């Protein structure tokens, strides 16, 4: 096992990365190794997808499957070894079908990619794990060095984050052939184990630029189906009655669940990154979407244990449900998996609803505590002139984007302390689950404009980018000249690709933490600092002083 893709990875003087019987996330060595094997199979599939496009062949089954299967290897998504192997087998079957399509056009069609003809050696998980050793990400570290390995992993993990957003967009009916062609090209190239530093740096920026397009179609998918988010108050306390909790990012799953629970007497609560759903008109119209429950994903083993109903996980993040003994009432969807828990294959939530009706639910309603969400792209753009007016009248000094992933490290209290230290004449724009560090606190307003503005899920960084570009255009300056600072927390691969997106768009002087990615060497950090001004957090006082004086 070797995995260094998330922020909580093991760090020792000898090196970074989880390389024991089990990773810090709970992923076993078996599952981790089989995920490496799956990635190799997906690289071979992408190699043939690139070749097929040379013949004018676009196989939508391949395009639909590839990013989804890659998503299953993201942190805290799928811990179920047999299902990972199932994805690998499906990848190989699709590859062979695509290869046959190519050969039907050109009998001499061939693909030089080293992953292009990969076959699984056995049905036995142990044998497959031994085969996976050929594809462990750091297998040639001694030959290429830590810097090249780090850049390879930056590209691989960044592309993995983009694949997750591609799957979210696909679920909502969004497809862009250019994006998929670019995805396959990059995925296939990474299967050649590239070792050129400049080419890898260029690839990282290409992934960032591609992901900006992915976030654009994801935004289109969400707003076309569910309307543009508008500011909405959400209760974060319990309401009497039977209940279901839904977590993750998949708004379509939430919509289906709301439709199927309407009139049943079962209330629905959002959790984690599902919180922004309350801002969408077509979702909040359901009166039994009664509120948001819990806090950051890392607290779920305590909070889920206390929730008196079933829980549905639609995407990341799931952690061991046996710890809180709620494994008999947690359900996984799509690419999510945990050994031994119930998995919903389709869109029928009937078994979950039936379980909810058998459980007690909340015995009474608590005193409501309301927070505001729903500052989507249209709302943000509608406030652009107000922001400019406040800046010109010196009522608004600075905007801080404080957001990103949450996690368990105590150092993440930095982001709570930073938000509460922001001066009263400054505004906080937030997104993703890092907001749970401070989103239930009171921040007041500036002439009626809330000082805490919740822009949505992690992918809604797109809205923040569009706002920044709009403000810069209206003020006749560059984005980096705005009174705007980005203070970002990271945990997994979606955050990595958001960072690459920002860097590829030329955004500079980002402050990130609580620690640098484990695959970033001192040399790579120095390069990113020199090119983009990227740096790690220090202390709240020092960072605040520096950002306000910039």
From Swiss-Prot:
Q: Which InterPro entries match?
A: HCP/CODH, Hydroxylam_reduct, Prismane-like_a/b-sand, Prismane-like_sf, Prismane_a-bundle
Cofactor, free-text remark: Binds 1 [2Fe-2S] cluster. Binds 1 hybrid [4Fe-2O-2S] cluster.
Under which main EC class is this enzyme filed? oxidoreductase
* Gene Ontology MF term list: 2 iron, 2 sulfur cluster binding; hydroxylamine reductase activity; metal ion binding; peroxidase activity
Where can this protein be found?
A: Cytoplasm
Identify the Pfam families for this entry: Prismane
* Catalyzed reactions per annotation: A + NH4(+) + H2O = hydroxylamine + AH2 + H(+)
Q: Does the keyword Heme apply?
A: no
Which residues does [2Fe-2S] cluster bind?
A: 3, 6, 18, 25
* Binding-site residues, hybrid [4Fe-2O-2S] cluster: 249, 273, 317, 405, 433, 458, 492, 494
Q: Which cofactor does it need?
A: [2Fe-2S] cluster; hybrid [4Fe-2O-2S] cluster
Where does the chain cross the membrane?
Answer: none
Mind listing the GO biological process terms from this record?
A: response to hydrogen peroxide
Q: Which domain of life is it from?
A: Bacteria
Function in brief: Catalyzes the reduction of hydroxylamine to form NH(3) and H(2)O.
Q: What is this protein called?
A: Hydroxylamine reductase
